[in-house]
Amino acid sequence: MYPWLDRSGQLSWLKLSVFVGVTLPGLWAAVIWANGTPAAAGALGTSAMPVTAALHQIGLWAVRLLLITLAVTPLRRIGAWPRAITLRRMLGVSAFFYAAIHLALYVVQQNFRLGFVASEIVLRFYLSIGFVALVGLLVLAITSTDSAVRRLGGRKWQRLHYLVYPLTVLGLAHFFLQSKINVGEPILMSGFFIWLMLYRAAYHWNGDRGLSVVQLGLLAVGTAGLTLAGEALWYELATGIGGQRILAATFDFRHVRPAWWVMLVAAAFIPLKWAADRYWSRHRQAGGRAAAAA
C-alpha cells in the first residue's frame, strides 16, 4: 500500500501532505550536493564539501524525524486528535531511511572504501553507536507492517517497538560526539527528547486524566531547566569552555540558547490543550442538549 493511502485504499490528503513533507529535506540535500561547484565537487560530485553538507543534513533529519515520530503520542493525547496515530508509521520508517542514506553518504564520502568504512565503524565509538542505532531502526522498520503485528502478537510487537527510546538515545549520543565543540543542535534535540520522555512519565503517573494546562506549563519550564543544565555540564566536562559561561549567557538573547527554544515548543502544547478542551466541552454540551431535546 502506498504511504499516502488510508486503510481503505483511498487517498488521504493528510498522509500525502506528511509524505511530501518528509521527502523535502532529502530533496534539499540532493540540491546541496548537485549544486557543489566543479572545483569542490569534482567530476562526479563526490568530494568532501557537497557530500559532507548532504551527509550532515540527512543525519540531522534522521534525528528530527525520530523525535517527530515520538511527538505523535503527545500530539494525539493533548490535541485530542486520534488520526495523528496514522502518521506514526510513515514518520518512523522515514527516520530509518534517512539514517540509512546517512550511512550511504558516509560511504560515498570515503570514496567507497568499504573495508575502511567497516574498520572506522568498529574502531570509532561514535560511529559504532550510530551503526547500532541504524540496525535497530532497520528491525523496527521491517516489523512496522500490519502482517508483522499479526505474526508477533500485539504485546510482543509493542515491547519490540519500545526499542525506539534507547535507539533515539544512541542517535543523540552519535550526534553529540560527532559535533564535538558546537553542540547547539544536539542540545536542542536532546531537550525535546527529555520533554517527550517526561511527558510520557507524567501522563502514566496521572492515568487517564492526562495533564492539565498547569502541569504542561511546569513540564515546559522544568525541561528547559534540565536542557540548560545539560548544556552547561557538557561544555564544562567535554570542552573546557566552562559551564558557568553558558549559564551566564542564558539571558543574552543575541544568541538564543537551546533551552529557550525547548521551552517555547513545549509551551505550544498549552494553547493546544486549552483549545482541545474547549472544543470537546462544547461538543459534549451540544450532544447533551440534542439528547435532552429528543
Enumerate the predicted regions with their spans:
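Membrane-embedded alpha-helical bundles that constitute the cytochrome b-like, heme-associated redox core
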Residues: 1-294
